[in-house]
Amino acid sequence: MGTKHNHELIFMEPVLQKRIWGGSRLKNEWGYDSEQDKELGECWAVSCNEQTDSRVTEGEYRGKHLSQLWREEPELFGREADGTEFPLLIKIIDAKENLSVQVHPDDTYAEEHEHSKGKRECWYILDCPPNAELIVGTHAKDRDELKRMIEEKKWDDLLNRIPVKKGDFIQIDPGTIHAITAGVELLEVQQNSDVTYRIYDYDRLQNGTPRQLQLQQGMDVINVSDEISEESVIHPKSKDNILQRLISTCDYLVWTIRVNGVASVGRIANSFLIGSVLEGSGKCNGQLLSKGMHFIVPHDYSLDRIEGNLRINFAAPVYS
Ligand code: ZN
């Protein structure tokens, strides 16, 4: 089928966000634009919310914002104009220091208490130090033990750590305590929500005062029976030029592909996709791709010919 709209990828302009734990790689290694060169924690690569509204960098929609496309060109996204919010947020995170230990609510809790969507997220590890570990889940047997260990600040005993390597992939469900640790750089695909309950911030100060914790809400939503272990980490092992699905949840699907030569993957979802070029460079149906680019693949667009030497991750929302 295909309408006049659906014949090109729509590239988005990344926006950097300052964070006290951020580094300088987003500017120096990814080439993203910023006036400063430290504490650059997050690249909001494809974003459509009150904080950042991604802008199209080239082509037919150049200069338009994602919110405008979402509202005015629903067919690009394979949907009706139904007043719902853009579903996903794509970030690259550069943690020079540890991020706070945190947890996110699910949709039900967030809608009731925050008038927001909940936050499910997942991580594709782009870089990390040797022997890196992420904090995912806890060792608490039940809610009473969790409460006691938090009150007594027994963080080392409480927090579960999992080893990770470059190229690993991890799903973080709402209710699972988690933290990105110093030195890790990752691609995050998440629900379009910013509701975070901070449990522990290493007693750090920001402008002389500790950042606020949200222990009560955190206790409400922490899932103590989550079974997170080393087996929860996916080690993608696909051959070159073969698309590999990393995860399928009720909110999104994520795939990765390493292209070396030519790959043809066609259409891989019934909605639109968001593509992120994580390594290398090449072309997709003639359009140039290089590391650090993020783009919308319109509904009905077919990824017929991806060529070059590059890795791309794709995310698709699941429409409810
Ligand atoms: Zn999080």
Predicted regions and their residues:
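Short acidic-glycine-tyrosine-enriched beta hairpin
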Residues: L159-Q171, N285-L303
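Intrinsically disordered, low-complexity linker/loop segments enriched in Gly/Pro
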Residues: D107, G118, D127-R161, K165-K166, ...
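C-terminal amphipathic alpha-helical segment
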Residues: Y197-A269
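Ligand-binding loop in jelly-roll beta-barrel domains
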Residues: E85, I93-N98, D107, G118, ...
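His/acidic/aromatic-lined binding-pocket segments of jelly-roll/cupin-type domains
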Residues: I90-K91, L99, E121-Y124, R161-I162, ...
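Transition-metal
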Residues: M1-K141, D203-S229, V254
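Double-stranded beta-helix
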Residues: V136-D157, L186-I228, A315-S320
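Short beta-strand segments in beta-sandwich/barrel cores
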Residues: A263-S264, E279-C284
